[in-house]
């Protein structure tokens, strides 16, 4: 068995346990059957039935086996909206062949967890002769899944077809509401969730009628095919967020993983060029302090803006005569690899203008935002640059900073937009290196469906700033977390906290007001940061500025985070708005352990009252009492506290206190 397959088996076991009622659940066995004029897919979590009466395909019903509730979905399975002419509904397409029921394909080499799991799928070929369209529809259900995915592949048989929208959900769903304000937000209804699986999708609910569609700009050319997908999932009572997260962890490009790394921004460069000697030195400093002296696993060293010569467009500056060869060798010696910042639209400020001038001289496409990734020539160049970095230097992560337009079509492009091009680019890179880490930053927003392609997205706001009261570092922490609340908690409540770029830990020479720590607040920043559960763990740190105690605090928290990854991946927001100086934090739960991190952003003492059942969103059958204690050595003298899960508990917080509690079931 390969190492990758072993890790995915461990992941699958953990998912199965977490979907239980506080205990291990039996593995769902997927059943698929055709009986008379109906097709059914089912496991112990969910069942779906479609009608194929009179040779047409239509929804019939869905059943949630956790709650025993049924959702009648009589109606169309999809709708295609042409720019001219009538809407083409699934009811107007005729089956070309009998339905095919088969095993879902399994790929042990895939980076997507779902592709490692067995399952069943139903496939139907449909045709509309008047519109000269062929549709391949399939529904897929896998082991361990609490959701059913539908894929619709459209193939034009005539010269071209100009479509304005692809509608994959159009049904009456009582109690439905869009869960968020960002594009690509799912719809929820009681213990159900529904969505079109794309970050550019849009959903609307009016009088319980749910419609989810994806705009399309380019015409579909004769012989060309394109695939879109939707999902409908069942959840347990009170467990919608957690069971939606189970879906995300199955289907995301790569399951959650701790990814600890250095970032050169604010340290080596701040719009300045740096060189190989600088880069190797910082790798050695972090490697010695964290890996050799403190046994911390480092994953990567990310070299941000400053490694390239902006007058040549994504070529190394003269200070890197051998590219990343020596940097990669140094990183590998500490068990890590190099990572690279690239900006599809060209970056920022003066270097961006230099890159644009170079691009235009070489005939690359541009648009209002800068370089146009969707341009045919620039796309090929940018893709080949990325692949070259992977092949030559073993680059294991890309920070893609800025993706340009979301709705402009470049002449000659095969993509609807720069965002569409970025999605295809990431797919090509993952095909070459499945475990590649991709951080997609500026231009993103909290749609969970970015995670079908990228590993993490930007939290929103400025890189760093200051809010609230207290020292500069305390005000930076408040600002960081106020942006999470504003742009993610309020705009996209089902986006996983575990997949945000928060702009890391900052203690660096070029970081405004964060190049020193006179108030000794660095431990608060470290403990709050790792308490978020984010997998993208960035260190914007100048090594020489840290004391031995600072390194110790950082190492302890980093190791704690990795050791508790299976719990922290459940991280969700608790409490109020940091900008209002309200107590807030994060909580996460697994059957073996729970973690609560609370922060008081005020210079006054504050109490926070809540039950563990509410904070942890405990499923039925969970422990009734938890033993709570801090994991930090500095709190080692404190005794464990027994907290009944269902009772209101008062947490007393000192000014600016960050309280971390590990909670172990004691009954």
Feature map (PLM): residue ranges:
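Glycine-rich, aromatic-flanked loop segments that form ligand/cofactor-binding clefts
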Residues: 239, 244, 260, 302-303, ...
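Acidic-aromatic substrate-binding/catalytic surfaces of carbohydrate-active enzymes
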Residues: 36-125
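Active-site-proximal substrate-binding groove within the catalytic cores of carbohydrate-active enzymes
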Residues: 62, 223, 422-635, 650-660, ...
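Active-site-adjacent "subsite" loops/lids of carbohydrate-active enzymes
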Residues: 268-273, 337-393, 404
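An acidic-aromatic substrate-binding cleft motif
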Residues: 240-300, 304-308
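The substrate-binding groove and active-site-proximal loops of carbohydrate-active enzymes
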Residues: 261-280, 307-322, 364-381, 404-419, ...
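Acidic, contiguous internal or C-terminal segments within carbohydrate-active enzymes
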Residues: 33, 52, 115-173, 589-592
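Short Pro-Gly-centered flexible turn/kink motifs
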Residues: 45, 216-236, 651-664
């Amino acid at each position: 068995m390969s190492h990758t397959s072993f890790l995915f088996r461990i992941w699958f076991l953990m998912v199965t346990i977490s979907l239980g009622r506080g205990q291990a659940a039996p593995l769902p066995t997927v059943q698929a059957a055709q009986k008379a004029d109906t097709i059914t897919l089912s496991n112990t979590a969910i069942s779906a039935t479609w009608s194929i009466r009179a040779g047409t395909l239509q929804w019939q019903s869905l059943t949630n086996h956790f709650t025993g509730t049924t959702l009648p979905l009589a109606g169309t399975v999809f709708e295609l909206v042409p720019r001219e002419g009538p809407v083409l509904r699934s009811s107007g397409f005729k089956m070309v062949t009998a339905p095919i029921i088969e095993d879902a394909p399994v790929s042990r080499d895939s980076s997507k967890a779902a592709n490692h799991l067995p399952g069943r799928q139903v496939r139907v070929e449909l045709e509309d002769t008047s519109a000269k369209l062929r549709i391949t529809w399939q529904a897929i259900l896998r082991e361990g899944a609490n959701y059913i995915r539908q894929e619709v592949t459209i193939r034009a048989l005539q010269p071209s077809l100009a479509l304005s929208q692809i509608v994959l959900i159009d049904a009456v769903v009582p109690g439905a509401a869009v869960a968020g304000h960002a594009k690509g937000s799912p719809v929820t209804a009681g213990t159900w969730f529904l969505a079109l699986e794309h970050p550019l999708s849009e959903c609307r609910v009016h009088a319980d009628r749910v419609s989810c569609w994806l705009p399309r700009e380019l015409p579909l050319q004769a012989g060309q095919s394109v695939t879109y997908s939707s999902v409908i999932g069942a959840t347990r009572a009170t467990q919608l967020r957690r069971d939606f997260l189970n879906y995300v962890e199955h289907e995301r490009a790569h399951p959650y993983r701790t990814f600890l790394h250095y970032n050169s921004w604010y340290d080596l460069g701040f719009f300045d060029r740096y060189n190989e000697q600088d880069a190797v030195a910082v790798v050695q400093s972090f490697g010695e302090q964290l890996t050799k002296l403190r046994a911390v696993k480092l994953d990567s060293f990310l070299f941000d803006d400053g490694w390239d010569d902006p007058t040549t467009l994504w070529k190394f500056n003269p200070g890197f005569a051998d590219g990343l060869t020596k940097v990669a060798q140094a990183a590998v010696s500490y068990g890590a690899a190099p990572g690279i910042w690239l900006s599809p639209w060209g970056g920022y400020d003066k270097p961006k203008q230099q890159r644009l001038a170079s691009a235009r001289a070489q005939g690359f496409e541009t648009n209002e935002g800068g370089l146009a990734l969707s341009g045919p020539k620039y796309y090929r160049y940018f893709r080949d640059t990325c692949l070259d970095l992977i092949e030559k230097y073993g680059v294991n992560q890309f920070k893609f900073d800025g993706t340009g337009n979301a709705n402009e079509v470049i002449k000659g492009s095969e993509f609807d937009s720069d965002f569409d091009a970025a999605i295809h680019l990431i797919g090509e890179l993952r095909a070459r290196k499945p475990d590649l880490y991709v951080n997609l930053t500026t231009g993103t927003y909290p749609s969970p469906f970015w995670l079908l392609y990228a590993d993490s997205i930007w939290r929103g706001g400025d890189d760093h700033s200051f809010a609230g009261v207290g020292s500069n570092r305390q005000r930076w922490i408040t600002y960081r977390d106020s942006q999470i609340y504003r742009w993610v908690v309020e705009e996209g409540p089902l986006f996983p906290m575990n997949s945000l770029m928060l702009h890391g830990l900052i203690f660096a020479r070029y970081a405004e007001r964060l190049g020193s720590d006179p108030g000794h607040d660095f431990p608060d920043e470290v403990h709050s940061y790792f308490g978020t559960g984010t997998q993208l763990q960035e260190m914007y740190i100048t090594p020489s500025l840290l004391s031995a105690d600072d390194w110790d605090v950082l190492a302890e928290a980093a190791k704690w985070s990795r050791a508790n990854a299976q719990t922290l991946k459940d991280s969700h927001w608790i409490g109020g708005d940091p900008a209002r100086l309200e107590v807030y934090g994060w909580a996460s739960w697994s059957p073996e352990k729970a973690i609560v991190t609370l922060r008081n952003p005020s210079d006054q003492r504050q109490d926070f009252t809540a039950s563990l059942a509410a904070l942890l969103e405990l499923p039925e059958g969970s422990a009734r009492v938890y033993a709570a204690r801090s994991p930090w050595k500095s709190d080692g003298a404190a005794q464990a506290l027994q907290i009944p899960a269902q009772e209101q508990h008062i947490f007393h917080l000192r000014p600016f206190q960050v309280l971390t509690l590990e909670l172990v079931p004691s009954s």
